[in-house]
Curated annotation (Swiss-Prot):
Its main location: membrane. Signal peptide: none annotated. One of its GO terms (molecular function) is aspartic-type endopeptidase activity. It catalyses: Release of signal peptides from bacterial membrane prolipoproteins. Hydrolyzes -Xaa-Yaa-Zaa-|-(S,diacylglyceryl)Cys-, in which Xaa is hydrophobic (preferably Leu), and Yaa (Ala or Ser) and Zaa (Gly or Ala) have small, neutral side chains. The gene is lspA. Belongs to the peptidase A8 family. It is a multi-pass membrane protein. PROSITE patterns: SPASE_II. This is Lipoprotein signal peptidase. Pathway: Protein modification; lipoprotein biosynthesis (signal peptide cleavage). The active site is at D115, D133. It comes from Mesorhizobium japonicum (strain LMG 29417 / CECT 9101 / MAFF 303099). Coiled coil: none annotated. It is found in: Cell inner membrane.
Length: 168
């Protein structure tokens, strides 16, 4: 259990930061009014009744909560099967779980997810998202990165094969 303590702390910190920022957005940012921070980044409070990019919004609150719980359970399963030396992957799994639970809290409390980050140019804009979504994306990237660098790792306990090559 001790080896999981930093990751559990990261999950709690991700949820707390996500919920705190969403509270600030809900109480201080007008609904669907763009507040430019820099030329390509704005705050824009809106609600997402689906999952990523409003997908599955027709599933309803209960269906989306069930999907989120199943995803968290699956990621927990993967995380527990990850060797302790894979710090990058474990960190990624913790961020995914923290982000998913942050959005799950929104959905359970409000019936929607609070989104507020908008990347844009004068002629284009990206989907509006939140910090929990960013945690999920960064976490997934870390898991993939760990897998990619894992291909280059030599097994530490591998011994040269004593089998003779076949003469075929």
């Amino acid at each position: 259990m001790r080896s999981w303590s930093p990751y559990a702390l990261l999950v709690v910190a991700a949820i707390a930061l996500d919920q705190w920022i969403k509270h600030l957005v809900e109480t201080g940012l007008p609904f669907q009014e763009k507040l430019d921070l820099v030329p390509f980044l704005a705050l824009f409070r809106t609600y997402n009744t689906g999952i990523a990019f409003s997908m599955f919004s027709s599933f309803g609150d209960t269906g989306l909560v069930v999907i989120a719980v199943l995803v968290v359970a699956f990621v927990l399963y993967l995380a527990t099967r990850t060797p302790s030396g894979h710090v990058i992957a474990r960190t990624g799994f913790a961020l995914i779980i923290g982000g998913a639970l942050g959005n799950l809290i929104d959905r359970a409390v409000y019936g929607h997810v609070i989104d507020y980050i908008l990347f844009h140019t004068p002629v284009w804009s990206f989907a509006i998202f939140n910090l929990a979504d960013a945690f999920i994306s960064v976490g997934a990237a870390l898991v993939v990165f760990d897998e990619l660098i894992g291909w280059r790792r030599e097994p530490s306990n591998a011994k040269p094969s004593k089998a003779k090559p076949s003469k075929d």
